[in-house]
Every structure is written in C-alpha cells, then in structure tokens.
Amino acid sequence: MKVKETGKNWLVVGASRNGIGTAIATAAAQQGNRVIITGAEQEPLSMPAGVGEYHQLDISDSLAIKSLATRFEALDVLVNCAAISRRDNEEEIEVFRKVIEINLIGNYEVIKIFEKALIATGGSIINIASMYSFLGSPKVPAYGASKAGIHQLTRSLALKLAPYNVRVNAIAPGFVVTEQTQRGRADAEHNSLVIARTPFGRWGLPEDIAGPAMFLASDQAAFITGQTIIVDGGYSIG
C-alpha cells in the first residue's frame, strides 16, 4: 500500500536546517503538493526541491505568525517541527523558560492561529514530539518537559478539533542525524551507546520521520487522531 497524496496545501514550520522538517517538506513536494516552509534563519541552509516558498518566522512572535497566516484561506496539512535545545544549561530558569516558550507555547500558538484555515479543509496537524516525551534525561529537562507537553497537547487538541474533522497527531523521533545532534554523534562514547541500545543498530535519518508524516497527513490515516507515533528504531523498548 503506497501512501500518495497530491494537490494539498502544506505548511512545514521549522524546516530551515536540513533536518526533519526539510525531509518532510521534500517528501510532500515530491508528491505534488504545494509546500511552504519556515525557519528562524533569514535563509534556509538549502531550499528543498519543489518547495514553493520560504519565510523567516520566529514562532515566539505572535504578529509574525498572524502575518503569515493571512496567506492561507485554507490549509490541508500543518507540520510543527520548530524546536530548540540548550543541552549545557537547561537547568537555568531563563533558559528553561525560553525552551518552553519556543517548543511548547510557540507551536501551540501556530496551531491556534492557523486553526481556521485547517477547519476549512478538515485538515491534519502533525506535531513533532520526541522520545523524551516519555523518557527522562538530566541534561535536557526543559526540552523533555516541552516535548512531553507536545504529546499531551496533541491529545487535547485532537479532542477539541475532532468535531471539525481536523486530525491532530504527533511523531516522537529517537536519535536522528540532524544538525542538532551533531555534537552527540561526534562524542564517540555517546555515539556508541546510542547505536548499542538501538535494535536497528544505527541513528535514524530525517527521511525515517518523513514516511510516517506522509502517512498521517494522508486519507489513509483518516480515522487516526490524538496519537503519538514513536519512531526511534526501537531505542525506547530496550
């Protein structure tokens, strides 16, 4: 069974750094969808093939989100990938607050502002959670808390938006090869531990997350809402 959906309007928030958001946007564009991406940077590291537009967007800026939303009367798929992590100092209150502001509050505000456009189509929202939605880590307490919040937010919004035929789901990646994980991959001990604990014996790739995203956005997932799919190569079951 091949998942293929064409001609839909997609917005992928947080797709400027050649990571998960970029892979999802690329997959959506390859299937003939109209895709717009955003990122915190002025320009993306590279523009995914087939993607129509890039907009710089700070998701802690309400006015900027509202300005972007004026471009959409209707939106079929919203993907929320924007997130930050501050591994060295997340225990500091101001840093903790900033991570929560971006990863949880910012993504929630994006959903709120684009809600009307998604209701217009009976659309699909895909949030990017994390295996840290379920696993603890002393080094990223703010990141883990924010991603646990995304998991619960997904469930709550799924209940709220179901009467409008809008589905809300999340994907919880494990260790994936991205710019954000570059430091960890360069640490030989950490890299070995990740590979040893992962039953598939490797780090995930952004494309490993794009496949489930395409499924959740498709009509084949029409009866799925409020779910968080863990995509971690089995890391969390070890």
Predicted regions: what they are:
Residues 130:
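Residue(s) in the substrate-gating loop at a strand-loop-helix junction
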